[in-house]
A protein has these predicted regions:
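Loop/turn-to-beta-strand initiation segments
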Residues: 1-2, 28-30, 56-59, 217, ...
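Conserved helicase/translocase P-loop NTPase motor core
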Residues: 1-20, 206
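Inter-lobe coupling linker of SF2 helicases/translocases
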Residues: 4-5, 9, 24, 45-55, ...
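A short beta-strand-to-loop transition that corresponds to the Sensor-1 phosphate-sensing loop
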Residues: 6-9, 35, 61-65, 103, ...
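SF2 helicase catalytic motif II
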Residues: 22-60
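Conserved catalytic network of the ASCE P-loop NTPase/AAA+ motor domain
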Residues: 23-25, 51-56, 67, 211-213, ...
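SF2 helicase/translocase ATPase core recognition
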Residues: 53-87, 108-143, 266-316
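Conserved Helicase C-terminal RecA-like lobe
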Residues: 112-132, 154-278
Length: 316
C-alpha cells in the first residue's frame, strides 16, 4: 500500500510541535519526502513533526538541499537519522555515502525516452532610462545614509541586519519597477504613495519580447505582487496568475485554465509560491524578472516548463 499526503497534514496550524496526526500513528516501512527542503528550518513545527514520523527507511528528494547555509543540509540529515556531529566536518563523506544525484542528462542516458528538448538561456542586460537612474541613485544614497546612521547608533546586530535587508528590498523594488518602491515607502510611513510617471526599460522590454512570440505560451516569474499586478494590467492577452494569496483550489483552476487557453496566453507566477510542484509543459517561453535569493530557486522555476513531457525547446 502507498499513502500520498501533503505537508499541510503534518503542519497543524496553531497546534503544538508535538501534535499527533494520523501519519504519526503508523510504523511505516518507508517514508519519501518530495521537495524535502520544505523541512529545512529545524525550528519549524513542520520540520519537527516530519522528523517524528516512524519509518524503517527514510528517503528525501530535493533539487535544493541547501538554501541559505549548510544548516539546511544538516536538518535534512537529521531526518535521515544522521547525527549532527557526523555531518559537521564530514560533509563530503556524507554526500558520497548518502546522496544519489541525477541530472536531466543522466536520466536521458538511462532511458532515451526521457531526453528533453534543449533549453536556451539568454541574459538580457538593459541600461536604465535617465529618470530610472535618477530614482535608483536616490534610493542608493538613501540606503547608504540609513545604514551609516544605524551602525553609528548603539543598536543590536539583529536590528542592523534588518535595516540592511530592508534597504536591499527597496533597491530591488526600484530596479524591477520604481512604483513598487514608492508604494513600499508610503505603506511604511502610512501616507499616500507618489505616482511614478517615468518609463521602465525592463517592463517595456518584457512586453516587447512577449509580443514577439504570439503563438507561444509564456511563464513570468516575479518576486513581488506589485509587479505582478502591473504586468497583468498591461497585457491584452489572456493572463493567469498564482501568488501567495491564491488558495489550493484556485491554484488548480488557474493551472487548468492556462493549459486550455489559446496560444499567446501568459501565466504570471510569484516564484516563492509557484516555482515548484507545477507541471506546465505547455509553456515554451520563461521570463525571470529578478534574481532569486537562491539561484537554485530559479532552476526549480524553469523546471516547471523544461521537464519530462516537454516536446519543444524552451527559451529562458
Amino acid at each position: 500500500d502507498v499513502t500520498i499526503a501533503p505537508y499541510s497534514l503534518l503542519s497543524v496550524k496553531g497546534g503544538k510541535a508535538e501534535a499527533v496526526t494520523p501519519l504519526h500513528g503508523v510504523q511505516w516501512d518507508r517514508v519519501v519526502l518530495d521537495e524535502a527542503h520544505e523541512i529545512r528550518n529545524k525550528s519549524s513545527k513542520l520540520s519537527k513533526s516530519v522528523c517524528r514520523i516512524q519509518a524503517g527507511i527514510r528517503w528525501i528528494v530535493t533539487g535544493t538541499p541547501v538554501f541559505n547555509s549548510m544548516d539546511d543540509f544538516v536538518t535534512l540529515c537529521r531526518f535521515l537519522g544522521i547525527d549532527k556531529s557526523l555531518v559537521q566536518g564530514m560533509t563530503k563523506k556524507i554526500k558520497d555515502i548518502y546522496i544519489l544525484r541525477r541530472t536531466k542528462d543522466d536520466l536521458a542516458k538511462i532511458n532515451e525516452r526521457l531526453r528533453l528538448p534543449p533549453c536556451y538561456f539568454e541574459n538580457v542586460e538593459l541600461d536604465m532610462y535617465p529618470d530610472e537612474r535618477q530614482m535608483y541613485e536616490f534610493v542608493f544614497k538613501e540606503a547608504q545614509d540609513t545604514i551609516k546612521d544605524t551602525f553609528k547608533a548603539a543598536t543590536s546586530l539583529n536590528y542592523k541586519n534588518m535595516v540592511i535587508l530592508e534597504c536591499l528590498l527597496r533597491a530591488r523594488q526600484c530596479m524591477i519597477w520604481p512604483q513598487m518602491y514608492l508604494d513600499g515607502i508610503a505603506k511604511k510611513n502610512e501616507t499616500k504613495p507618489e505616482q511614478w510617471v517615468g518609463r521602465s526599460h525592463k517592463m517595456e522590454t518584457l512586453f516587447e519580447m512577449i509580443g514577439g512570440h504570439p503563438q507561444e505560451k509564456t511563464l513570468i516569474f516575479c518576486q513581488f505582487v506589485g509587479e505582478m499586478n502591473y504586468i497583468q494590467s498591461q497585457l491584452e492577452c489572456p493572463t493567469f496568475r498564482i501568488d501567495g494569496s491564491v488558495s489550493k483550489e484556485d491554484r488548480c483552476t488557474q493551472l487548468t485554465n492556462f493549459k486550455r487557453a489559446p496560444p499567446g496566453s501568459v501565466f504570471i507566477i510569484q516564484i516563492k509560491s509557484g516555482g515548484q510542484g507545477l507541471n506546465i509543459q505547455e509553456a515554451t517561453r520563461v521570463y525571470i524578472m529578478a534574481p532569486a535569493w537562491n539561484p537554485a530557486t530559479e532552476l526549480q522555476a524553469i523546471g516547471r516548463s523544461h521537464r519530462t513531457g516537454q516536446t519543444r525547446p524552451v527559451y529562458v
